[in-house]
């Protein structure tokens, strides 16, 4: 998809530019039990970094759940650097920020990917970064992929802005972190975006940001630099790289004999979907992150990272146990679909009561009245294998909304294919597409 909306505007308005790197957020301490939440958050923000329909959908969802999502784009002759910042204040006053970069989206990004030569990496200011990379007598310095370095320099370390005191955005970010040593910055991305997040963290480290403030989580990251780069920066930042089993891109640069090596904590995921999907796509990483989260976090309500302020109904919503009619290949997805649907409704509406049992319509309406609910939502999820597309499915969501005395308010059916999104996320997409109709039926 063409990114004209980003290319045509070099920056957001001045006020947004000022806010972009005014982080002022407290560190989010992460226990071992919270790692699935952080991985899912990183996957969400990485997905939102893309400008396709899926990315725009995730951005809308993040904003609905009280995330502030801002974007900026800076074009140079070498690259079109794009960066996004997601921020949220938690209930206890802590705030979290995630800096993300998109993967390959346009022709200029492809040129960046194919710029395979290695350039020297060093310096303690943007001017020095540029000078060192342009130098030739630097055998003792670390070296990095030229295209990835071009992308990061364009995004954060090229243009000095009056709004940042004639500093680059990257310098403003580094200074903000150094002034507030209690702060933590998460950096994330997929593919090209993964490489950019690591190079950015290394640049911030060279600007004096200490390791405890830099946490990098990547998906399908190619190698970025040589052995010297790996050994130097493995102690200057926290780096977790999540790799899908059989993802060909994660190892492609090592196979080219350019001296690029991987480092950091490696976590290998094996895709559990039975759909026929390319193992490098961000949608598959997001799908696995969601599954790991559902497996690890067994609660009645979503984690506070994924909650916002629900819309208050004039009378509660009684949600019938979902009806699922899925082909055998998607049967294993049923618990995840049910959990995702539950959380999506719980986040959007209040009060809600969820039924766990089936029954007749009469018993359903009676249960809703007994629970003090004015509305009843009935959802049916179904899918069929597409013969013309191996491993792909046609999914349908049917929604009925009634009053608790049995009066039908809304009946709607929506369908999509599992082309761009796996089944779980595709059903969530259908739910989101029906939000306006559902809201209207519920009197919102």
Positions of predicted regions on the chain:
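N-terminal secretory signal peptides that target proteins for export/translocation
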Residues: 1-9
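Bacterial N-terminal signal peptides
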Residues: 15-27
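A conserved cap/lid and substrate-binding interface adjacent to the catalytic center
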Residues: 70-188, 206-213, 236
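Serine-dependent carboxylesterase/thioesterase catalytic core
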Residues: 171-253
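A structural "domain/chain start" motif
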Residues: 305-349, 439-444
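C-terminal/domain-edge helix-coil "capping" segments
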Residues: 310-315, 386-390, 400-444
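Surface-exposed short loop/turn segments
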Residues: 360-415
